[in-house]
């Protein structure tokens, strides 16, 4: 199963991949991380650290490599070495919107060519503190890559996650996880009742 992670820089994409990877490793799954956010050296490095920490595979061509080529090669590795799940980390440079669109289209195209039906899921990571910006981000990423799920990060403290409800309802996308902090166990399955209660208490 191939999962594409999308979202603007700074929302906690790489950390979220690491945390979900850790949960899957605990379930005995063989997981491969692909560093297709090649514009930030820190992103490649950070994903590598998470791979090591979780005992996951790691595929990277370093900084400035062509993201679609990295994804294509990762597909090869995943198929050849029989990984259960491939997580692809992508760039989130919204200020270069058309480049970003092209890049995500290209990544989707090459992985679909490698494995019909891939990516099987496209997950948008949204920072709970971004407010109305999240709606605009969702619109752009939905056009570029399609979105199957939302994961809400930085919900720790007083951050109001109300915008996530707006995004979820407006675009009909389910929220699957919420990130409450930096630790491995701080990523939890989304519970609508708890969430509504927390929102109302604020």
Locate predicted features.
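P-loop/Walker A NTP-binding module and the surrounding RecA-like catalytic core of P-loop NTPases
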Residues: 1-202
């Amino acid at each position: 199963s191939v999962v594409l992670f999308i979202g603007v820089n700074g929302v906690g994409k790489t950390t979220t991949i690491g945390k979900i990877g850790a949960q899957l490793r605990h379930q005995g799954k063989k997981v491969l991380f692909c560093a297709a956010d090649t514009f930030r050296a820190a992103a490649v490095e950070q994903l590598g650290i998470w791979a090591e920490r979780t005992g996951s595979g790691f595929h990277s061509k370093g900084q400035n490599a062509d993201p679609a080529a990295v994804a294509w090669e990762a597909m090869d590795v995943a198929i050849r070495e029989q990984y259960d799940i491939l997580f692809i980390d992508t760039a989130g440079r919204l200020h270069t919107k058309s480049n970003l669109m092209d890049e995500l289209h290209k990544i989707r195209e090459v992985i679909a060519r490698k494995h019909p039906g891939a990516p099987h899921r496209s997950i948008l990571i949204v920072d709970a503190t971004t407010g109305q910006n999240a709606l605009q981000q969702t619109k752009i990423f939905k056009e570029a890559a399609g979105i199957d799920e939302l994961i809400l990060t930085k919900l720790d403290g007083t951050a109001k996650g109300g915008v996530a409800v707006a995004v979820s309802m407006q675009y009909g996308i389910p929220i699957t996880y919420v990130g409450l902090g930096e630790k491995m166990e701080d990523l939890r399955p989304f519970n609508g009742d708890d969430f509504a209660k927390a929102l109302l208490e604020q």
